[in-house]
Amino acid sequence: MSRHGLYNNGNTCFMNAALQCLSVTPSICNFIRIYNTEDENLIKLITKFNLGKCKTDTIKLECRKILDNQKETLTNDELQILTKLEKSSDDIFIYISFKDLIKKLDSNRQTNTDNNTISQIDRKPLDASPLLSITRELASGSIFENLFNGSQNDPHEFLAYILDRLHNSKSTSIQIKLPSNLNEIDNYYKLYLQHFKTRYENDYSYFVKNLYYYIINCVECSKCKNISTTFNPNDIICIPVPTQVNDKMITIYDCLNEMFKTDTIVYTCENCGNKDKNLIENKIFSKPKTFIIKLKRYSSTLNGRSTFKLNNMICYPDILNINKYFCGKAETNYKLYGIINHSGSLNGGHYYSYVKNINPDYKTFNEQWLCCNDTQVSNISDEQAMASQNAYMLFYSLIE
């Protein structure tokens, strides 16, 4: 066993389970490493101007005062950092708190330079309350306010929130050049490149290439056969759970088949105006390096008056192949390294995670599964990890 647990600060098991999985996600670990120099300069500036002592709602104002009153004495780096802080201080302070916690979660493993082995150090539980406090404060009055109100909440919502904040903390403008032979290439790829440029040229970060990916939606008119195409950026894929699959055990592939099946859609053809029996097909267009799956276990009755939890056992593999759902031709396989489980009922359950520690290369994983249940961390067998009836979210890393 080589991992810190996390204290539960009042129904924060959803957050703890998500943080444990993020802390062993290769894209997240590398994200934290590549910004070390930039972050050192950021912390120095925050310390120099005592911005860390400011309330979150006054930091932007303080940055503006410094820029107005001390501009002549500031270095170019300080000008850039203060300008970024004025624009995105909320996201940046969440990032700083998140990074500090993730580094501590990873600090239970250190390399012995004499024999290149990994030694164990103190594994006392860690407290995520600094991250909880700042996210709660900054979410106040927003659509995310209920996420940090002390009630049982959803790790998927927390992941979507924190990933967006991390992206915003490093978001910048870049020049994205389209190929000179744009009109000669495949039409779908052309549309993808144009959408990518429009969406990310002024909002680009490390996450765009490492955690985000595109899903393509094609709608075909049943009458004139015109095809309308849209591209949607995505970071977490939410897949339905079939109620029955020929009396057999449900697998993750059954869920993916349901997600990516050709279906009818209410749609008015932009070419001929036909509304009847139009078909939609979805596929993954750009290959994600991190493939996070949410199983839609929470469902509503037909009349929509009540919600219930689907407790079906869903079989998931150690190696996931998504070739069938991907537009590319190359083999696309993923390695399972994290699972968020939910036990209990819809209104009174508990979240915990299974994870594999990431190796020092930040690409591969230790083969020992660990159960992280708030402060408690214990070894579990492969059989136990791979047969959880409580599996709710699955974390896969691209095998390159």
Which residues does each predicted region cover?
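Exposed substrate/partner-binding surface patches
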Residues: M1, Y7, L19-L22, N50-K53, ...
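USP/UBP deubiquitinase core
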Residues: M1-I185, I292-K294, I380-I399
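A broadly conserved sequence feature marking short terminus-proximal activation segments
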Residues: I143-D247
